[in-house]
Amino acid sequence: MDKDAKNLTALEAERELEWLAKEIARHDVLYNNHDQPEISDARYDALRRRNIEIETLFPELVRADSPSYKVGAPISERFEKSVHAQAMLSLDNAFSSEDVHEFVERVRRFLRLPVTKTLEMTAEPKIDGLSLSLRYEKGKLVCAATRGDGYVGENVTVNARTLSDIPQVLQGDFPDILEVRGEVYMRHSDFQDLNVDQQEKGKLVFANPRNAAAGSLRQLDTRMTARRKLKFFAYGWGEVSEMPAKSQMEMVKKLKEYGFVINPLTKVFKAVEDLISYYHFIEEGRQHLDYDIDGVVYKVNDLLLQTRLGNVSRSPRWAIAHKFPAEKAMALLENIDIQIGRTGALTPVARLAPITVGGVVVTNASLHNEDYIKGLGSKSESIREGRDIRIGDTVIVQRAGDVIPQIIDVIIEKRPKGASPFVFPSLCPACGSHAVREVGEAVRRCTGGLICPAQAIERIRHFVSRNAFDIEGLGEKQVEFFFHAQDETLRIHSPADIFTLQKRQEKSLTRLENMEGFGTLSVRKLYDAINARRKIPLSRFLFALGIRHVGEVNARRLARAYQNYNAFETVAMTALMPCNKEDKGNEEWLELTSIEGIGVRVGKAIIDFYQETHNRDVLSSLLQEVTPLPEEAAVADYSPVAGKTIVFTGTLVHMSRDEVKALAERLGAKASSSISKKTDLLVAGIGAGSKLTKAKELGIEIMDEESWLQLINEHHI
């Protein structure tokens, strides 16, 4: 991450995105499920920001497991699952005043607000705690759930009822259904008392109030939660049967009327400069607060504008978190490990003696590639004044972002005698194949391909992962066990092997039930979990295949566009890419690449995947065992445009082009940029030209912008 993203080559960007996706996912699990973060929030934010920056510059390289489309982490198995009626999204981050100005300008452009139009924003401290959603029906608390992965959380209702800040019954005139979102936290004074008590009882102390709050709320013993003096600030909402307010601030005040505690520092401002001043005011005064904060959150105050702005994959367009600066610390570099990714990339990871930076325990840091270790940048320029990194060094670690921390320098004066330069392996540690670094690349890659167990195992892990086939009982350790099994009736080397496991076992004398870590009950549950996935939504199926650049979002786009697998496969097998500048490719190619978000790079990756004989063989075997189901509608049945392909052309007056496309997609339609026989509707603005003419020739339904808005409004959307 030392190199400016703008100067990255496509290959360098691809390698770094691979590392970011894996590390961010690992730390999401540590933070959300185990309450044991290894890095600071600032470091976590920096990595997420780096990921978004690279994806923005290289949209064609967005990965199937991109953290940009994920919120939180898959939930643990300690609590029952609770599905959020509305997704609990995360927030994009700002790290400077310039970022805040850009955010406000971005909002104005999306809404087409003139400079003279005032844009009110709320500002509030960003509480460093555990996000919680509280569902009330007829004024009574019926469910409390953690964020989880943003869509499904942990049901902690019994524990939440012990918090004095959470009303069991709402006060005043409240909606029939109300989901309140907020943050569970622990005051500094209560945190200190808790750790004193832990020490006296000979128990482990907590690293910081956030960990203590999260661990306390997720206790299996409710009495333990009740003793921990947890607090709750309400700041938002999810599903509401009837909105009682027109602005963010008005709604927050309503929450107070209902009986919730709101942060008294929440304010409304009309100018960006006032937001920045408020940020510095809070930053300077944070030491006097009795709870942890890690920034300031800005939100568009007008709820109608919030609705128009909508959301992107993992965050709302109408809010942003302005984070406080990073912190630094010295750490001892104990070792350097080499990890092998699904695509064969060799990634060095620093193992550090545990240190605490800003209350967060740090044990790992990325070393990016061999040049970075040598003290060289992406263009072979000197970094860190040429100081290389060696095992045994004392290094400067900066917490400023996402997944693992960043090593920014080496303390040469503390280098032990005899410390030798690190020799990057030229052979893959997993399979012994040559690790080749091609010209212009920063990363070495294993050439073992399918014979490399590390790569093959990662592919299977991806296939069974939470957002793909989501097969319970096939975690990392189990996948490794089955992959390395000596008995062929236990071996899993391809996706189809998963679904033939039970049949092979029925004819075997080597019983899985007798293996260490398994038993009759666990094996039965595993088979049930596997058989439950023999029918799966098309989007999950496509994502599970691991086609480069086809992440969760693109998989959903493809599934929505083609509805069934046969239609998708036909296009993937018959699409012909342009062979020269004059050639535009055949109709299937144009159809594929005209899907919103699916461009030339993604289309090429899909075609390349299906042209590979091995991939077709794997798919053929897999399709004998599983059935991809037509994609379910992403919106309610009453959406007038659900499932339709819409093209917008000409100049639109009331909404920006981005806004109408985003609205169409939220309503279950596919926004396309080109007219074809499969187009259902053309919305024509002022000055519509050739697309309007072609639509008339093809007999496609046409309406103007006013009719489009009327259609939407008639259905209360």
Curated annotation (Swiss-Prot):
Entry binding sites for NAD(+): D41, A42, R43, Y44, D45, S90, L91, E124, R147, E183, K299, K323
SUPFAM superfamilies the UniProt entry points to: BRCT domain, DNA ligase/mRNA capping enzyme, catalytic domain, Nucleic acid-binding proteins, RuvA domain 2-like
EC class name: ligase
Molecular-function annotations in GO: DNA ligase (NAD+) activity; metal ion binding
Active-site residue numbers: K126 (n6-amp-lysine intermediate)
Cofactor(s) the record lists: Mg(2+); Mn(2+)
A matching Pfam family: DNA_ligase_ZBD
Domain BRCT residues, every copy: 636-717
Record-level GO BP terms: DNA repair; DNA replication
Annotated EC: 6.5.1.2
SMART domains, A to Z: BRCT, LIGANc
Catalysis: reaction(s): NAD(+) + (deoxyribonucleotide)n-3'-hydroxyl + 5'-phospho-(deoxyribonucleotide)m = (deoxyribonucleotide)n+m + AMP + beta-nicotinamide D-nucleotide
GO cellular component: cytosol
Binding-site list for Zn(2+): C428, C431, C446, C452
Keywords: DNA damage, DNA repair, DNA replication, Ligase, Magnesium, Manganese, Metal-binding, NAD, Zinc
HAMAP family: DNA_ligase_A
PANTHER family reported in the protein's UniProt record: CHROMOSOME TRANSMISSION FIDELITY FACTOR 18, DNA LIGASE
Main function: DNA ligase that catalyzes the formation of phosphodiester linkages between 5'-phosphoryl and 3'-hydroxyl groups in double-stranded DNA using NAD as a coenzyme and as the energy source for the reaction. It is essential for DNA replication and repair of damaged DNA.
Similarity section: Belongs to the NAD-dependent DNA ligase family. LigA subfamily.
Name of protein: DNA ligase
Naturally occurring in which organism (per UniProt): Bartonella bacilliformis (strain ATCC 35685 / KC583 / Herrer 020/F12,63)
